Amino acid sequence: MSSIKETAARFFEVCEAGLGWSGCRQHCHPDATFSAQAHALAGVETLEAYTEWMKGTFEPLPGGTYELKAFAVDEDRHNVTAYGVFSATHTGPGGPVPPTGRSIEADYVYVMEFDGDRIRHMTKIWNDTFTNEQLGWV
């Protein structure tokens, strides 16, 4: 395993477990940036903010899990791509409406760009509108 592959795998695991920045920071540059073309993530511009946002999703979606479908390293471009499916049911407090009891299976992709052996930037590709519809949030 390459160093960036190991780092990306560890980051993915702790981020998707909802451990927030305290669990993720060791894998990232302190000022790592974040981007996504998703309304739910508007204004989230740092990886620290994103990992805390992910942590917060476990309040309305307790027991959320993921299935890693693909994981690839591009050594030439110094990035790692992970494709997963996040599954959860809205049973907890939080979210824009009271618990709906509805479930999601949301496809998403992370593209983690490295500077040295740490993540410098991450892009999330995700259809938040579809996810919010599945949950009954829109």
Locate predicted features.
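C-terminal and inter-domain tail/linker signature
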Residues: 1-138
